[in-house]
UniProtKB/Swiss-Prot annotation:
Name the UniProt record assigns to this protein: Pantothenate synthetase
UniProt gene name: panC
Naturally occurring in which organism (per UniProt): Cupriavidus necator (strain ATCC 17699 / DSM 428 / KCTC 22496 / NCIMB 10442 / H16 / Stanier 337) (Ralstonia eutropha)
Binding site for (R)-pantoate: Q57, Q150
Residues at which ATP binds: 26-33, 144-147, 173, 181-184
Pfam families membership: Pantoate_ligase
Length: 282
């Protein structure tokens, strides 16, 4: 596996590779990331990964400086997965001058849910993903469904800019107790780690309530509020538990709900100092 930091060297290395499958990451790789590499191999060849902790998507009170950076360990994991190239640029490599041009998602998708609680987050995500796409020029890119809103935003960005890239969604990888794998799980204390699977169980409770209700009389807002209250009683600080349409992450109208519109439940909540996100399709 070649480890490359220069944009030009990456382009030179991939010249003529018109079926490359790309997996962008911020490093600190776990089994969830490695499953993305395996899925990428099913859809393209060679597999190209990137590791870059993108300052643009971190807010002023977020964990950019303490975000775990484990490059040597990550390299060993990617080598075992048969990744062809790892693009691991420095901040100077990616942004040799101030990044004055940004890619901003539409407000109806970028300023809701995560965007409401992390202003500017998706602008930073879209900007770096667009730049990474420009660097790697892949035919396929794989994004995990754990970051459901990010997946939707990247997919729409690719459509809007007519980029010749297929976006492949990857299922969330979970621990045996249901907790979605995340680099931030390492911040949990032992007691918090024992409590953390409650977030996924709460999503299942919401799904069971929705599926078991009479749709004509169901009150989705009340279901959401009850789920937040349940988490709060256990010591969580929930930002949202929200039932949305899968197609555009907007709240379903009563008519859409009655017609059986495919839905997804999304949540974000703090447990101690650690903010966890998860989702479950209905």
């Amino acid at each position: 596996m070649k480890v490359i930091s220069s944009i030009q060297e990456l382009r030179d290395q991939l010249r003529g590779q018109n079926r490359a499958a790309f997996v962008p990451t911020m490093g600190n790789l776990h089994e969830g990331h490695l499953s993305l590499m395996r899925l990428a191999r099913q859809h393209g060849d060679p597999v190209v990964a990137s590791i870059f902790v993108n300052r643009l998507q971190f807010g002023p009170n977020e964990d950019f400086d303490k975000y775990p950076r484990t490059l040597q360990d990550d390299i060993e994991k990617l080598q075992k997965e048969g990744v062809y190239v790892l693009f691991a640029p420095s901040e100077r490599d990616m942004y040799p001058e101030p990044q004055e041009y940004r890619v901003e998602p539409p407000h109806d998708l970028g300023d809701i849910l995560e965007g409401e609680f992390r202003p500017g987050f998706f602008k930073g995500v879209c900007t770096v993903v667009m730049k990474l796409f420009s660097c790697a020029q892949p035919r396929v890119a794989v994004f995990g469904k754990k970051d459901y809103q990010q997946l939707m935003i990247v997919r729409r960005m690719v459509q809007q800019f007519a980029l010749p890239i297929d976006i492949i969604p990857a299922e969330t990888i979970r621990a045996e107790d249901g907790l979605a794998l995340s680099s931030r799980n390492r911040y949990l204390s032992p007691d918090e780690r024992a409590e953390a699977p409650v977030l996924y169980r709460t999503l299942h409770d919401v799904r069971d309530t929705v599926l078991g209700s009479d749709r004509a009389s169901a009150d989705l807002l009340a279901v959401e509020a009850n789920a937040k209250e349940s988490l709060a009683r256990r010591g969580w600080k929930p930002d949202y538990v929200s039932i949305r349409k899968r197609v555009d992450l907007q709240a379903p109208t009563r008519e859409e709900f009655l017609a059986g519109e495919p839905l997804v439940i999304l949540t974000a909540a703090k447990l101690g100092a650690t903010r966890l996100i998860d989702n479950l399709e209905i």
